[in-house]
């Protein structure tokens, strides 16, 4: 079955796996999902990214992070902002600060996919893909 929104699919798989305290989760690989996974790793939400398979069957294996002795997920919430039916674009000044800077907005810019902090530093705006905190 065709997936019409791979970003929402990725966020849902990560959210479900972290709620069930799984060590890893698999996500279909694409340039966009790789870029989002790299931003999540840079921001400390996932620990490792591995790739399995080749071609259209390739999958990213994401190692999820937990904190404390009760293994609380580092990802509390993931929300899709810009959707296929309603795209949300922001300029540099309009980029959101998630939870006053504690969370991350993932932005697709002309310079690639990056966090809101990096986009402000680069002075670029773009499509607000999701919020993670």
Curated annotation (Swiss-Prot):
Alphabetical keyword list: Ribonucleoprotein, Ribosomal protein, RNA-binding, rRNA-binding
GO process terms (BP): translation
TM spans (from-to): none
Region Disordered, annotated ranges: 1-30
A Pfam entry, by short name: Ribosomal_S8
Chain intervals with Basic and acidic residues compositional bias: 16-25
Record-stated family: Belongs to the universal ribosomal protein uS8 family.
NCBIfam families tied to this protein: PRK00136.1
Role, per record: One of the primary rRNA binding proteins, it binds directly to 16S rRNA central domain where it helps coordinate assembly of the platform of the 30S subunit.
Subunit structure: Part of the 30S ribosomal subunit. Contacts proteins S5 and S12.
Record-given protein name: Small ribosomal subunit protein uS8
Protein's organism: Synechococcus sp. (strain CC9902)
